[in-house]
């Protein structure tokens, strides 16, 4: 999250006239992230997040806000979009689509342990199953076609070795995406960006037997219909990684994957192609971080991410493919 479009007190007052949320108590920009303009909004009725969409169009937005509503109705803890006075879930602010959603309980866990990975794995599988009957379709907009368009734009900014890796991995992924194995992988709505800063944890209730409690997943604005295994790979590549080296942390990865498959067991095809999908998940974020780093947009409070982090992860996944754990109950 970031702030590309500033919102004055007068702007906010006019915007809030379309909502039955009481009086504004506090309003401030959120500095993290790189895609939309985001603000914490506190009113006399509760805590919310206002998002101005910098790239998504009004025609694309119903997929995202309706998906959150759908998941919330199916018991998945996600932000619920707040309806305006005309019943719609988003409007226009400074000529761009904008929406208000409820703020989830809890705080991000930026140094996750095994117990956090168990919670995330189980809920990710529940989210995938809950989305099976979601009627709208929107492809993952940061998948293979976007990689093909973006790699030539960033190629002038990287070393010869990096360019060879970018182009070689693009060819590898194109072949993977064209395979019968890929076509047969289970699919549906995916978060596509479930990093550790896009989930919140709250204090566990006493006597539940759990040391942590997942407050929910948020920031669904990179979501799209994709292979569920891609969503799992993106999640594992962030939650279960040794930050200095990019290597997988075996204990956390095993915990997350076993927890996931207690809800939705992996297919034989998913097991066979896990290594390729880990590489796809790493490649997607290396490409996007290179693009955001070398071709940034003007923004207030923008903090671009280090592209080198996902380059290290990609190289690690190429060298060490890994395997999905065998099916048995998660401890």
From Swiss-Prot:
GO MF, one annotated term: homoserine kinase activity
Keywords: Amino-acid biosynthesis, ATP-binding, Kinase, Nucleotide-binding, Threonine biosynthesis, Transferase
The EC number(s) this enzyme carries: 2.7.1.39
Pathway info: Amino-acid biosynthesis; L-threonine biosynthesis; L-threonine from L-aspartate: step 4/5
Cross-referenced InterPro entries: Aminoglycoside_PTrfase (IPR002575), Homoserine_kinase_II (IPR005280), Kinase-like_dom_sf (IPR011009), Pseudomonas-type_ThrB (IPR050249)
Class of the enzyme per the UniProt entry, highest EC level: transferase
Pfam families referenced in this protein's UniProt entry, alphabetically: APH
Catalytic activity: L-homoserine + ATP = O-phospho-L-homoserine + ADP + H(+)
UniProt keyword Glycoprotein present: no
Biological processes annotated in GO: threonine biosynthetic process
Homology family: Belongs to the pseudomonas-type ThrB family.
HAMAP family: Homoser_kinase_2
Stated name of the protein: Homoserine kinase
Organism: Burkholderia mallei (strain ATCC 23344)
Gene name of the record: thrB
């Amino acid at each position: 999250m970031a702030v590309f479009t500033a919102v004055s007190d007068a702007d906010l007052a006019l915007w809030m006239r379309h909502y039955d949320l009481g009086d504004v108590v506090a309003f401030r920009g959120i500095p993290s992230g790189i895609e939309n303009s985001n603000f914490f909004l506190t009113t006399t009725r509760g805590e919310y997040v206002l998002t101005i969409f910098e790239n998504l169009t009004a025609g694309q937005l119903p997929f995202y806000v309706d998906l959150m509503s759908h998941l919330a109705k199916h018991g998945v803890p996600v932000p619920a979009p707040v309806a305006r006075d005309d019943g719609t879930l988003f409007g226009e602010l400074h000529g761009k689509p904008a929406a208000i959603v409820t703020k989830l309980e809890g705080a991000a866990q930026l140094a996750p342990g095994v117990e956090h990975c168990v919670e995330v794995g189980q809920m990710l599988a529940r989210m995938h199953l809950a989305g099976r009957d979601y009627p709208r379709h929107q492809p993952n907009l940061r998948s293979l076609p976007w990689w093909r368009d973006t790699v030539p734009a960033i190629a002038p900014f990287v070393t010869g070795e990096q360019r060879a890796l970018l182009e070689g991995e693009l060819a590898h992924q194109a072949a993977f995406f064209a395979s019968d194995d890929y076509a047969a992988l289970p699919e549906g709505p995916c978060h596509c960006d479930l990093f550790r800063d896009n989930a919140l944890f709250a204090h566990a209730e006493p006597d539940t037997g759990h040391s942590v409690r997942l407050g929910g997943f948020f920031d669904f604005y990179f979501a799209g219909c994709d292979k569920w295994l891609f969503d799992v790979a993106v999640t594992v590549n962030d939650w279960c990684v040794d930050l200095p080296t990019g290597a997988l942390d075996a204990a956390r990865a095993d915990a997350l994957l076993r927890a996931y498959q207690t809800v939705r067991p992996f297919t034989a095809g998913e097991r066979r192609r896990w290594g390729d999908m880990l590489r796809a998940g790493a490649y997607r974020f290396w490409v996007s971080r290179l693009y955001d780093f070398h071709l940034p947009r003007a923004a207030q409070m923008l903090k671009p991410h280090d592209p080198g982090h996902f380059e290290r992860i990609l190289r690690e996944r190429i060298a060490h493919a890994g395997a999905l754990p065998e099916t048995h109950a998660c401890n």
